[in-house]
Curated annotation (Swiss-Prot):
Stated name of the protein: NAD(P)H oxidoreductase RTN4IP1, mitochondrial
UniProt gene name: RTN4IP1
Top EC class, one word: oxidoreductase
GO MF, any single term: NADPH dehydrogenase (quinone) activity
One annotated GO biological process: regulation of dendrite development
Keyword hit for Zinc: no
Cell location: Mitochondrion matrix; Mitochondrion outer membrane
InterPro entries linked to this entry: ADH-like_N, GroES-like_sf, NAD(P)-bd_dom_sf, PKS_ER, Quin_OxRdtase/zeta-crystal_CS, RTN4I1, YIM1/Zinc_Alcohol_DH_Fams
Organism the protein comes from: Homo sapiens
Pathway: Cofactor biosynthesis; ubiquinone biosynthesis
Amino acid sequence: MEFLKTCVLRRNACTAVCFWRSKVVQKPSVRRISTTSPRSTVMPAWVIDKYGKNEVLRFTQNMMMPIIHYPNEVIVKVHAASVNPIDVNMRSGYGATALNMKRDPLHVKIKGEEFPLTLGRDVSGVVMECGLDVKYFKPGDEVWAAVPPWKQGTLSEFVVVSGNEVSHKPKSLTHTQAASLPYVALTAWSAINKVGGLNDKNCTGKRVLILGASGGVGTFAIQVMKAWDAHVTAVCSQDASELVRKLGADDVIDYKSGSVEEQLKSLKPFDFILDNVGGSTETWAPDFLKKWSGATYVTLVTPFLLNMDRLGIADGMLQTGVTVGSKALKHFWKGVHYRWAFFMASGPCLDDIAELVDAGKIRPVIEQTFPFSKVPEAFLKVERGHARGKTVINVV
């Protein structure tokens, strides 16, 4: 009997010790995912609830404020944004199939879950809040960024972006000026540097042809090519010739004064061609490259997203692969490289671009600014085409 009492007492003591350890010694695990909790607060924004023409744009005071979901994200208070041709196309449903796959790769959500959708890719503003893993930014920092098209856009009071997509704003620019550059700059940078392989160390003396030189991408491309000591030939209309010459273009060809092909025949062949126009230009433009010298034609006008919209994900990707593969092979046998390029969000690339801006080698080219209340008018302006720089929205 005494032995039984001793066993019971020992067991109770062990139970008490285990209970004390579980309560005191063990620390609860912490999920390092978000620094913000869901909010009930709202913000002003321009959104669309369906795809269509300009009348689908709707202003609301009740868009839910973004929150940080991942530890590498930051929330930016938008001071200025801009409208790009991609925004006009997305308003009409361009790329919806591929972009929705990126938003929801497991197809968990039902059709239309992307709405209300905020457009706008460029942002210049001030950091309001940082995720736990963000080391290079802090609240109060002035930053700029280009937001990928599958994310909620920048035509709102606040936007959340990944830390690797954002960069410190050039000190020499206002927010309005800075908002004109990120998307077009990164698109051109992708084509010239990442795909074309050109940089400040190998560009001196290279002959470069830019088709569609007076728009946002073209005006940036001229300046970065000249900053790297290339010889630039710009193709644009006569009324934009003064602009591109001021940006540094060595030769200017007016596409309205006659056949561009005929005018190019009087010039020496090129080492690099950047095509912002597309269409029939790619049938003749690569012929003006230097043969068997590593010369490259890069186009930013591709059927990638349209193929997916028209054929679906699988068939669209297959068609895209066949198209780019066959064209690259055909031009390879002609002694030139044929490539496609796309916008790539990158904070580190924006760091490099900011250095060029602050060094005075690149300046923003703004055609027109609009107040936040006039976003639909800005869309109509961009939709008309024939840009002479960028269209910027002052949000603050």
